Every structure is written in C-alpha cells, then in structure tokens.
C-alpha cells in the first residue's frame, strides 16, 4: 500500500505537528429489570495536522472500523471500539494561510511520494542532487526533509559494504605481500652474512698462503702431497677447496719450472753424448750400473761416457748436472736407493711426477667448474637483491597511495559535514528572523 493510502505507516518520514482531540459520545442511561443503570460511551479521536512546510492544514478522523487497511495495521494487535484506531484517511481539507510565511513550499518528501534524486558519477565517486546541491553519496548527511525509499537505502548500504570489502581485500593482499617481502629480506640478510663470513675466511687463507710462498720451490714439491692430504682431512669443505686450489696452482708452477730445467739438461746431455760417440763409439761394461737414476729418454751408452773418471772437463760438468737432476727426481718421487740396479722401478719412479701432474690438473679443472657455479649463484643472488629492492619501492609507493586516499576521504567527510552544519545553522537563523512584507528573504551566498 502506498503512503497516500496509509499515511500514518510512514509517520517517521513526515515532519509535521499533530494535535489530537478526543470526542466522547455518551448515550442515555438504560434501566434494566434488575434496576441496573447502563450507559454507553464512544470516544472518537480527531487529529489536526499542521505541516512545517507551508502546506495547508487538514483534519483527520481516525478509522472506526476494526479491519486493517495496510500490512502494518494488520500486524498490530486488535483493539476495541473504545480505543482509538491509528489509521485513517484525510477526510477533509480546508484552505488557509500558511502558519509560517518564511517556510518553503511543500516538497515531494512531505507529500510522502517515492522520490529518487538524480545521480552523476565522476571517476569513481557518485554524487546525488539533494536539497539544491550535489552531495557525495558515500558521505552525505540525510536531510530531515528528504526520505528516500527503502530500495534506495538498500542499494546505498550494499554499495558501501562492497567498497569496504574491496578496501579490506586490498589491505589484506598488501599485508600478505609485505609479509612475503619481509621473509625474503630476512633470507637475503642471512645469505649476505654467510657470504661475508666466507669472504673473511678467504682473505685469511690468502694471506696465510702468501706468507708461505717465501719458502723454496723444491721443498714445496717434496711436501705438497702430505700437505694436501692433511688439509683434506682437517679443514672444512670450503677451506679445503680453496687451499687445494692454491696448492695445485703452486705445484703446477713448480712442476713446469722443473720440467723446463730437465728439458734443458736433457738437451745438453744429448749434445754431449753425440760429441762423445764421435770420439769413442764403444763403451766399457763396468759403467752400466750408473744408468739406473736416468729417465728412459737416455740410453746406456750416453750415461757411461758421462761418468768416466778420465773424461774431458766438459763431460765431468755434464755428469755433475745429471747427478743433481737425479737427486731432484728422487726427492720428488721418493727414495729408491735399493732399486738403482733395476730398470722397472726406474720407469715407475720417472712416471710418478707425470701422474701427479695429471691428477692435479683434473682437480684444478673440477675446482674451476665449482668456482664458475659459485659465480653464477652470486650473480643470481645479486639479481634477487635487485628484484627485492624494486618490490620494496613498489610496496612503499602503494602504502603512500593508500595513505593519501585515506587523507582525501577524511578531508571530504569533514568538508561535507561542515557545509551541512552551516546550512542547518543558516536555516535556523532564517526561522528566527522576522517576516518583512510577507516575502521570503534572499539567502546569502554559500561559503
């Protein structure tokens, strides 16, 4: 039922003054046989409604029927004839002058009509035309003369709830992202600390190794295998890798120098041997055992001519250099004094430095591969740090944007509230101002 059919159902939306008179009708007393006097009385309430907005007053008699006229009246308890009904129609209207000439004319809200104000959407804000001005729909104040329908309130409530839900979801996602960034930052800090510790240890080991490089190369060649074994057994994985890499490099250098020296000695020995063969083509059998310390590249006839006691001074010098070379090889490969007369052990002793060199080269290649992998991991770590820094900047920008949005909302709310209060105060001032020639005064411009 519309508000015109049952106007008192929407009494909370009407802004008027109501005066009620109760008329009581008494009937004549009836005398019964039992000498009892009975009199009947009927109360009729009369309401005179005086609206506040310059409308005509009208008289309203309450309904005397007990049948409900609307859904709200049907839900109320049934009353007797003596109790006044609270629903009626306007029975009579009479014209008269408005009680307050300064009041404005009747609006649609005063007539209890369904009124949907015009709306305009600018960017993501909705504005409503209310009381002669455009007001933001999310933060506007309800006017006492404006009573929108229930569907309008329902839609507005749902819009506000949807906006709040979106803001909550956005804040939740930002919190989750911030938490993930914090965890990633903690992990990166831990990795940075570990890398710093490794770098300090690497510096210490490099300084220790540089101090050890002052010792002679031959002494290092003889003790390199034992030092490598001890380091692999005692030091941790990282230290052992770095130490073995450095030791292998030093051993490779020493072995290269040793091979160059041996090649030079072998070239000199071959030249002297060719010159001796031209002088004496035959060799004595007593000088064969002295050939045990030479490498397989040298023949037995060459060694016999170098070790003759009655040879020329050049051959004696060559024999001295070969003996020194033999001692260096024996120190590098180990003592072999008992096996000097056999050819098989001499071959194994001469092949040991080459085998050691091959193993060292293999270890060096493996360590180079590990170093390359570590460098790739370091590059990936730097890339992750850069991404983390970019994420932190984006998170900071989002946080500042949300902060500015909240500040803008607060400013808009305060401005609308202040303007609404100023308008209410202006209207109250107009109400207290005296009338001049029964004309409405002009309103000053809004601040």
Swiss-Prot record:
This is Protein chibby homolog 2. PANTHER family: LEUCINE-RICH PROTEIN, PROTEIN CHIBBY HOMOLOG 2. Homodimer. Binds to NEK1. Belongs to the chibby family. SPERT subfamily. GO terms for cellular component: cytoplasmic vesicle. It comes from the Eukaryota. It holds the Pfam family Chibby. InterPro entries: Chibby_fam. Residues 266-276 have a biased composition (Low complexity). Keywords: Coiled coil, Phosphoprotein. Residues 208-244, 266-320 are annotated as: Disordered. Residues 164-197, 237-264, 354-412 form a coiled coil. Residues 218-232, 277-290 have a biased composition (Basic and acidic residues). Transmembrane segments: none annotated. The modification Phosphoserine is found at residues 41, 85, 88, 96, 123, 143, 147, 149, 211, 224, 272, 275, 333, 336.
């Amino acid at each position: 039922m519309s508000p015109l059919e049952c106007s008192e159902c929407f009494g909370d939306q009407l802004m008027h003054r109501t005066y009620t008179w109760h008329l009581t009708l008494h009937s004549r007393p009836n005398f019964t046989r039992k000498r009892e006097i009975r009199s009947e009385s009927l109360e009729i309430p009369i309401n005179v409604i005086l609206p506040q907005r310059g409308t005509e007053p009208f008289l309203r008699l309450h309904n005397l029927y007990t049948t409900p006229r609307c859904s709200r009246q049907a839900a109320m308890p049934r009353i007797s004839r003596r109790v006044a009904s609270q629903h009626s129609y306007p029975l009579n209207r009479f014209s008269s002058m408005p009680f307050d000439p300064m009041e404005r004319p009747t609006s649609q809200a005063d007539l209890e009509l369904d009124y949907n104000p015009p709306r305009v959407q600018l960017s993501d804000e909705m504005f409503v035309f209310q009381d002669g001005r455009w007001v933001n729909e999310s933060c506007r104040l309800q006017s006492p003369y404006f009573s929108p329908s229930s569907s309008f309130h329902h839609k507005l409530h749902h819009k506000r709830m949807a906006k709040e839900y979106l803001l909550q979801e956005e804040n939740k996602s930002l919190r989750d992202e911030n938490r993930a960034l914090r965890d990633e930052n903690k992990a990166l800090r831990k990795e940075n600390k570990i890398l710093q510790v490794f770098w300090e240890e690497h510096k210490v080991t490099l300084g220790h190794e540089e101090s050890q490089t002052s010792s002679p190369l031959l002494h290092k060649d003889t003790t390199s295998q034992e030092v490598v074994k001890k380091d692999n057994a005692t030091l941790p994985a990282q230290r052992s890798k770095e130490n073995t890499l450095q030791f292998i490099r030093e051993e490779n250098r020493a072995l290269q120098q040793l091979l160059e020296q041996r090649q030079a000695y072998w070239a000199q020995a071959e030249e002297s041997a060719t010159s001796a063969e031209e002088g004496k083509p035959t060799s004595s059998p007593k000088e064969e055992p002295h050939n045990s310390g030479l490498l397989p590249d040298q023949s037995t006839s060459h060694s016999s001519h170098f070790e003759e006691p009655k040879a020329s001074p050049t051959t004696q010098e060559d024999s001295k250099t070969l003996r020194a070379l033999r001692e260096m090889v024996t120190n590098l490969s180990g003592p072999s004094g008992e096996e000097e007369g056999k050819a098989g052990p001499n071959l194994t002793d001469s092949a040991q430095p080459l085998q050691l060199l091959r193993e060292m080269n293999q270890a060096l290649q493996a360590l180079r591969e590990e170093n390359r992998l570590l460098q790739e991991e370091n590059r990936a770590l730097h890339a992750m740090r850069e991404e983390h820094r970019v994420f932190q900047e984006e998170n900071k920008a989002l946080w500042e944007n949300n902060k500015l949005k909240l500040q803008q909302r607060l400013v808009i709310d305060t401005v609308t509230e202040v303007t609404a209060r100023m308008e209410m105060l202006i209207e109250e001032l107009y109400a207290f101002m005296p009338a001049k020639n029964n004309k409405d005064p002009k309103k000053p411009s809004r601040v």
